């Protein structure tokens, strides 16, 4: 099965699509040093062309960087997320890579400022719609 290595945070797309994978979590230490030795001890031993997190290993295929990994799973241009003028277009009948990117960006903003979407009902509605959709298996 696939192996996903990442910091101890998100793995939404694989979970949502019910994809079988082995998980390798790397935990960053606490402030002020933020010890990264869990990752640094194995970083150059994984035979990755560009050793970085996240990484995805699927057989002979070894990929690093979030967007590169997501492109492998779903071939959608990520730059659409930046164009909110077309907001209603990127969430269609099925969730796509762009929807996950959008959700992630909005959710991270809410972590820093929980009320940041209060004046944007369309974005709040998008957040609610995302995970009310049925799971899209492969």
Curated annotation (Swiss-Prot):
GST N-terminal domain: residues covered: 1-71
Subcellular location: Cytoplasm
Enzyme Commission numbers on file: 2.5.1.18
GO MF annotation, one: glutathione transferase activity
This protein's UniProt keywords: Cytoplasm, Phosphoprotein, Transferase
Catalytic reaction equation(s): RX + glutathione = an S-substituted glutathione + a halide anion + H(+)
Extent of the signal sequence: none
Annotated positions of the Phosphoserine modification: 1
Principal localisation: cytoplasm
UniProt xrefs under InterPro entries: Glutathione-S-Trfase_C-like, Glutathione-S-Trfase_C_sf, Glutathione_S-Trfase_N, GST_C, GST_mu, GST_superfamily, Thioredoxin-like_sf
One Pfam family linked to the record: GST_C
GO cellular component terms attached to this protein's record: cytoplasm
GO BP annotations, alphabetical order: glutathione metabolic process
Protein origin, superkingdom: Eukaryota
Span of domain GST C-terminal: 72-135
Positions bound to glutathione: 6-7, 39-43, 52-53, 65-66
Stated role: Conjugation of reduced glutathione to a wide number of exogenous and endogenous hydrophobic electrophiles.
Quaternary assembly: Homodimer.
Family assignment from sequence similarity: Belongs to the GST superfamily. Mu family.
Name this polypeptide is given: Glutathione S-transferase Mu 5
Species of provenance: Mesocricetus auratus (Golden hamster)
Higher taxonomy: Eukaryota, Metazoa, Chordata, Craniata, Vertebrata
Gene: GSTM5
């Amino acid at each position: 099965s696939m192996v996903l290595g990442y910091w101890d945070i998100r793995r939404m797309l694989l979970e949502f699509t019910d994809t079988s994978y082995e998980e390798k979590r790397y935990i960053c230490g606490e402030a002020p040093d933020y010890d990264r030795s869990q990752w640094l001890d194995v970083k150059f031993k994984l035979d990755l062309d560009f050793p970085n997190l996240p990484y995805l290993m699927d057989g002979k295929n070894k990929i690093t960087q979030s967007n590169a990994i997501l492109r492998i799973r779903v071939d959608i241009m990520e730059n659409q997320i930046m164009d909110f003028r077309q907001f209603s277009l990127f969430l269609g009948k099925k969730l796509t890579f762009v929807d996950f990117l959008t959700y992630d960006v909005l959710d991270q903003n809410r972590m820093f400022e929980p009320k940041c979407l209060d004046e944007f009902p369309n974005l709040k509605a998008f957040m609610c719609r995302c995970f009310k959709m049925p799971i899209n298996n492969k």
